[in-house]
Amino acid sequence: MKKFVALLLVLFVCLPVVAACSTLQGDNDKGATISMYLTDFPQTLDPAAVQLQADTAMIFSLIYQPLTTFDEKGKVKPGLAYEWYSYYDNRDEEYKMYFKLNETMWSDGISVSADDVVYAWKRILSPDSESPYASLLFPIKNARQVKSGIMTSDDLGLVAEDDKLLSITFEEDYDTGLFAEAVSCIALSPLREDIITRAIKNNTDNSREQDWDKNAAIMVCNGPFRVQGLEEGVKLSLERNQYYYRDDEEDKLDRSVIPFRLVCYYENEKIDKKDTAEATEQQFQADKFDAGKSFYLGSFDKTTFAKYASSVTTNKLLSTYTYYFNTKNDILKDAKVRQALSAALDRQAIVNAIGKNYIASTGFVPSGVFDTASGTDFRKAGGDIYSTTADTAKAASLLNEAGVKGGTLRLAYLVPVTKNVANGLTDTFGKISYELASQIAAESAKASWESLGFTIELVPVYAEEFQSTLSSGNFDIIGVDYAVNSTDAIAYLAPFATKYSGNKVSISLDAETYTPHYTGLSDEEYDTLLDEVIYLKDRTERATKLHAIETKLAELCPATAVFQYTTSYTYNEKILKKISSNYYGYNDFSDLRMADYIETNSRENEESLNEAKTRSTEDESEG
C-alpha cells in the first residue's frame, strides 16, 4: 500500500512537469500562426541548385537539415548526424569516415535515412546536374571521375551501410574535421529520390509550376518546418513538420517546434486600388509591421532599413554579390581589361547606395570563411585584394597596357520575380515596385565603366530566364548572388577550375570531359593549383595554397566580388524569446513564441474573412 501511495505521489508531482513541456493551450490548439516578412519570394527550393538569391538560404535552414551545423561561434556540432568518426581500412588500405544519423522523419512521416543523403550527393555529382557545390564532395573517392562521366555513381566512395549509418571512402587521407565542417553546407542536405523522380516523370509539359522545388504539394522536408503554401506574388507559408524529432503517437505537437505556421503574404498586397502612392514591397511590409499585422521583418530597402536601424540585428552571410566576365568576349578576353573593370568599381559607394549594412568586398572569398582552423578568418589572414573605392588611375593604366580604349558591353542583372508576376503586379495595381540591390549596383558600375570610355547597356533578366542566360554564356558581364554558404575557401575558388565547375557534362564519346565555368575561363596553371590542394590534409599548408589560388584568380579575373551580403531583422514585442542564429547567419525559429497568439490569430482570421467579403463585393460591382 505504501508503494502504491508513493507511486501516486510521484505521478502527481510529475504531472505539472509534463504539462509544462507543451506551450499549447488545449486539445484543439496547434500553436501560433506568425505573420512575418521572412525574405523575398524564393525562385527555387532545391538546395543544391544555383541560387539566384542569397537570402533563400534563410528559408533552406528552416526546411532542410544537413549532417552537421555550426553554433554561433563557428564550432561544428551535430545536425542530422549525432556522431562521426574516422577509420582506416587495413585490408583495402582506404581512409573512411562514418556518420551516425539521428532518428527523425520527413514531413510525410517517412524516416530520414542514409540513402537520402547518398541520393542527394550523387545527384550533385551527376554529369546531368548543374551545381556549384560539387567541389565540396570531391575528397570522396572517384567523385571527380563520376562528375565527369568517366565512372558511374556506383563507383563513388559513398554507401549507406544501413538506414542510419553513412560510410564515406576518401580518395586519399583527409582531415575528417574539415569534411565535417564542409557537410554543414545547407546545399548538401538529404533529398528524397522517390519524390523527385516521380515529379520529373509526371511533369510531362516541363511546367515551372510542377517542378518539385516550386510546388508545396510535392515537396517534403526534413527540417523543423515544411512548405505548406508557395505561390509567387501571393504567399509563402511554412508549417511545423510534425514528424521532426518527434514520436507522432507519444509526444506533444510542439515537442521540437513551437510555432504552428510562419506566413509571409506578398500580395498586399491587397492594396487599396484608389491609392495613388507608389511604394516598394519592403515599404508595404514595413507598414504591416508598424500596424501590428506582421511580427518579424527580415528584408528591407534603403528607406525602411534606415527607419529601423536602431533596432535591427545584423549577421553576415557567407555569400557575395559578384560580377562574372565572359572571357570569350572580344573586349573582355584580355585579363587586364577585366582587372581594369574590377579596379574601377567603387564598392563602398555601391554599398552606401544600397543602404542595408552590406560589406564592401576586399577579396573574392568573403569574411567569415575559415583559414587554418574554425574561428580563424581567411579574409583577415589574406588581407585586401580589392580596393573598396574606385582606382581609376590603375584601371586606365591596365586598359592602356591591353590596348583597349572602349567598346560596348551588356551588363545583365537579376529581377528576382518571373515576368508574368512582375507584369501582373503592374497591371493590377500599378504601384508595386522593387528596389533591387542588383540594379543599384549595375547603375553604379555603368557610371564607373563609362568613365573609362565604355558604353554599358543594362539588361534586366527575369528569374525564369536567369539560369539559361548563365548556362548559355549569353552575357558580357552578369551580376550573380554567389551564394556559396560554406566556411571552406575552396568552395568559392574551385568552380573556376575546369574540372571543378560543377556544370553539366556531356557523356558522349566525342564531348569534352569537363565543362568550364560560366565565365568560360580555362587556365592550366589555375587548374594545377586546385589539383594540388583538393586532397590536402594539412590545414596550414592548405590555407597557404588557397591564398595563392585566390591571388591567381584575381590576376585572371574571370569574376570580381562587389559586396558581401548580410541579413538583418527586427521583431515585434509580442515575440517573447530572443531569436538565435548560427554561424551562417541563419535564424532558428523552432522555439519562436508569441504572446496572446490565440487572440491575435482569431482577430487575423476575422479580418481576413471581412477583406475577402469586401473584395468580392467590389469585384461584383465592377463587373
Each language-model region and where it sits:
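N-terminal lobe/hinge region of extracytoplasmic solute-binding protein
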Residues: 37-90, 220
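Alpha-helical secondary-structure segments
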Residues: 114-120, 163-167, 224, 259-261, ...
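Gly/Pro-rich hinge or "lid" segments in bacterial periplasmic/extracellular proteins
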Residues: 182-261, 266, 271, 607, ...
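Structural transition elements
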Residues: 358-401, 416-425, 430-438
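Surface-exposed binding/hinge segments that line
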Residues: 133-202, 229-231
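Detector for C-terminal structural segments
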Residues: 235, 342-376, 428, 437-446, ...
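Ligand-site clamp/hinge motif
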Residues: 244-304
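Aromatic- and charge-enriched surface segment that lines or borders ligand/interaction sites
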Residues: 83-136, 167, 331-333
